[in-house]
A protein has these predicted regions:
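Core nucleotide-handling region used for phosphoryl-transfer chemistry
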Residues: 1-417
């Protein structure tokens, strides 16, 4: 199921911004964003577009062209703004067939408005997905030519294990109210790429053990199987390198439980290697019990991770009551990373001690710092190359000499008549 990026919600609150006459701060769900003054009233329905929404290139959104039509976390007059709000009439301008009279709170407008999700160019899914060494590629081609054995396709993420994803705290008002006081633990949300390692015993007759493994071990990215123990698979992917580094297949065979280890990998070429690490690392954030069809509790998570000689994500607090306060968790997310204290942490994940629910709070200051970094990189890429004047003069001399020599003349010479 795709993430809803644009939907109809009510304006919960409006408050002034210091030293600002033409703008004010609106609250939609748990999000705070800057809007034009007097454009909305409390209780109005509005079209809210989340951060990382990429709006279509249509005339009504032309003002977003300098931002490449992307909605980002920004700060205006010391007020952090996350998302953008439009009057309901905007939908009709983009999609004339839309019936405003039938609009209801919570309606997903992502497809109706033609909105897509922004993805980082260097995301591991884009940059490293299905990467193979030339030897593996040649071996696959050779098997096809000689034995007519087709190369193995990795396949989609297994349906019997939940994908690694967390909902932002700004959309969890109902849960905070219902579960207030529930014992939770809070862990750092690491910036990297999610990975899942699955061990599953295969049910079959006695012959199955003679002609193959009695188990299946899978290494997966967020959306795909990268490695399958029962097939010839790609081992050059960073997720496979982590598998080898921590000897995960052997350890999970020894553990002999139908489980999925889920974590975050980070290091060179992954999300810009924000922690400045020389090699890939993995931190475990959850373990899914395939037989019980649920995540294991905190005590079991800690015990299994220790038995497998793996590291958990940094844990900040344990056994603390859930607080019904979105702003509290947004504020708590703003701190230094425990992996590298020189950088801000991406955010936090709040999970019940029994793992019955979880959600994330992303650090707005971290998002702002990343946007600033990306903007500087783009400016450097777009900036034309310049040379000091003396370099240009020397280059001109070299070019002149080269032309003269190609004409068969001595340097600085004249053509004889």
């Amino acid at each position: 199921m795709k993430r809803a990026l644009a939907y109809i919600e009510t304006i919960k609150e409006l408050k002034p911004i210091q030293d600002a006459d033409k703008i004010e701060c609106a609250t939609i769900l748990g999000w705070e964003l800057v809007v034009k003054k007097d454009e909305f009233k409390v209780g109005d329905l509005a079209v809210y577009c989340e951060i990382d929404s990429v709006l279509p290139e249509v005339p009504v959104f032309e003002f977003l062209r300098p931002k490449k039509f992307r909605i980002k976390t920004i700060k205006i007059r010391k007020q952090i703004s996350q998302g953008i709000a439009f009057p309901l009439s905007i939908v009709k301008e983009v999609n004339p067939s839309f019936d405003i009279d039938k609009a209801r709170i919570g309606d997903d407008l992502t497809e109706i408005l033609g909105i897509s999700k922004y993805e980082l160019d260097n995301d591991i899914e884009e940059e490293l997905q299905e990467k193979r060494s030339w030897i593996e590629s040649y071996y696959g081609w050779l098997k096809w030519k000689i034995f007519r054995i087709k190369p193995v396709k990795t396949g989609s993420f297994p349906s019997y294990v939940p994908k690694t994803d967390e909902t932002r705290v700004q959309k969890m008002e109902g849960l905070l109210f219902d579960k207030e006081g529930t014992a939770c633990y809070i862990a750092e949300k690491c910036e990297g790429s999610s990975c899942t390692y699955i061990y599953r015993k295969l049910n079959g007759n006695w012959l199955s053990g003679l002609f193959g493994n009695k188990y299946c071990f899978l290494a997966c990215s967020r959306n795909q199987i990268i490695y399958n123990s029962n097939k010839s698979s790609n081992k050059t992917h960073p997720i496979c390198q982590i598998m080898t580094k921590y000897d995960l297949e052997r350890k999970l065979i020894k553990l002999n439980k139908n489980i999925a280890i889920q974590g975050e990998i980070f290091g060179p070429k992954i999300q810009g290697n924000v922690y400045g690490l020389p090699e890939y690392q993995m931190r475990v954030f959850s373990i899914y019990d395939i037989d019980e069809k649920k995540y294991v509790d905190y005590e079991s998570l800690w015990a299994i991770t220790s038995e497998l000689e793996l590291n958990m994500v940094p844990v900040i607090q344990t056994n603390v009551p859930l607080i019904n306060d979105i702003k509290y968790y947004v504020g708590l997310s703003n701190d230094k990373s425990k992996i590298n204290s020189n950088i801000l942490r991406e955010g936090i994940v709040i999970r019940a001690m029994d793992s019955s629910f979880s959600f994330k709070s992303i650090n707005p200051e971290y998002l702002l710092s990343q946007e600033s970094k990306i903007s500087k990189q783009q400016q450097q890429e777009e900036k034309p190359a310049t040379f000091p004047r003396e370099t240009v003069v020397n280059m001109s001399d070299e070019i002149r000499k080269g032309i003269t020599l190609r004409r068969g003349l001595p340097t600085g010479g004249k053509r004889s008549t």
